[in-house]
Amino acid sequence: MIRCGIGYDVHRLAKGRKLILGGMEVAHSRGLEGHSDADVLSHAITDALLGAIGAGDIGQHFPNTDESIRGISSIEILKRVTKLLAEKKTRVVNIDATIIAEAPKLAPHIAEMRKIIADAIGIPNSNVSVKATTNEKLGAIGRDEGIAAMAVATVEQE
């Protein structure tokens, strides 16, 4: 059976943090606040995958009250969720994701993000789409207060 899930995440930008998107560090004057590495792209994909199998959301599986996972790599979270999918006899078919940010420019990093995500999930790069757009200076994202991401995951369950 083919199933689909959708995910969304947003984090505030803060000084003194590294900006991690799609599992890679992107040069920027600020990074994203969060309990983990705050990688909004990986978090949105994680939620899409969990949604596709009806398994709740990232906060249920990796709560921000769990000090044992403080600072965890969001790529590690993706790997753990992929293992959960395999236990449920489900394979990832496709990921389509969009990052919404005023800065920095992300186009030069998209190919590497796709590779890191595809490797974490165990699918070909061609099955992972990552796009970037701005919020046209509207709202908190448009004022460069944070970065958001949304994702759709298609999975096949036996």
Model-predicted segments: where are they?
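C-terminal binding/interaction regions
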Residues: 3, 94, 104-107, 123-142, ...
